[in-house]
Amino acid sequence: MRLAPVAIWGIRADPAVMTRVARRQSMTTHAADACLEACEAYALMLRAAILGADFDSALENARGSYGPHIGPIVAGSWRGKARDQISSSGFVAHSLEAAIWCVANTDNFDDAVLLAANLGDDADTTAAITGQLAGAIYGASTIRASWLEKLAWRDEIEVLARILAFPAGRLGSIAYSGN
């Protein structure tokens, strides 16, 4: 789920438009209903978190009418699960559940991403998805400098993120409003 850019752009867009973009960007490689629903729900979570919502409020913001794979996860089916009950197989529902579970069961960016990576299986996917939410919840300033220093194209990524969030002529204050 390569959704952070969509959610960053989405802080200034109507949530319905942002979710359409989230679904469409998924269609380029993953067009199954579960993939589209996961992208919609996660984009809404990320958008809310970027705008300042805490974890529970961001999750609540993603509530909606989803199918049998994604609906239970957004409703909280992962709550109370132990680590050995969380799969990181690469299937979209497993990846979404694992990412949400990792952030819910930690209190900082490092621990969330490391927990995701240490689940094994499709660890890079799970950690990347987790990192998007952990970064949105805990803030970019909480990411280890040593990790950021190794990031390829870091300067370009940061510039593009600023452009997505604050396009020319649209600078100003933003805050979570429950949408």
PLM features: residue spans?
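Amphipathic alpha-helical interface segments
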Residues: 1-106, 112-119, 133
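Conserved catalytic/binding loops enriched for acidic/polar residues
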Residues: 124
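Conserved glycine-rich phosphate/nucleotide-binding loop
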Residues: 136-179
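Short amphipathic alpha-helical leader/targeting segments
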Residues: 18-19, 130, 145-149
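Short, small-residue alpha-helix embedded
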Residues: 127-138
